[in-house]
Amino acid sequence: MKRFLSLLLCALTLSMPVAPAYALFDSKSPAQQRAEILKQNDQIMARLYRLEPHAKELVGKSAGYATFSNFGMKIFIAGGGSGSGVVMRKANQKPVFMKMVEVQAGLGVGIKSFSVIFVFETEKALNSFINSGWEFGGQATAAAKYENNGGAYERAANVSEGVWMYQLTDNGLAAEITAKGTKYYQDSDLNK
């Protein structure tokens, strides 16, 4: 019985939510946080262009794009993640800083970090993302290759009307793009 209680206590402790990634920024000033997110944005885009050169064409024709750096953990039946990012408009307007949170259920154990890039074909799609945020419900999975489109759209997933998504993992471009109860929203502290 004592061993069972010890194992149960261990399992409960390990399944506690992880501090959000943006909590790591708490000791930094808003200006430092913004600078770090912009640097992270440049690194994500450079990596995307290196792994998928055609993506540059898609971004070049777009109204803008968003990058997010995410960290997630799953232990036993529950998991979650968080991250930060920025929306860059093609018109060189002020960047819009964002946050994301993810909740997932199902058996598994693991820790992952990944980057997500959204490319917005239209101002309408871009403004909707900025002003209303965005949520993936349940288990939304999109194949990361659309053979019919080819070129710039190859290895990107069309996740909404006028919105394309790339997901980068430690191993490169994800073969499948998954969002499990993920919400994207403006960071009110960094957009002041």
Give the residues covered by each predicted segment.
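C-terminal segment of classical bacterial N-terminal signal peptides
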Residues: 14-22
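Bacterial N-terminal signal peptides that target proteins for export
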Residues: 1-8
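Small-residue-enriched, tightly packed secondary-structure blocks
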Residues: 24-192
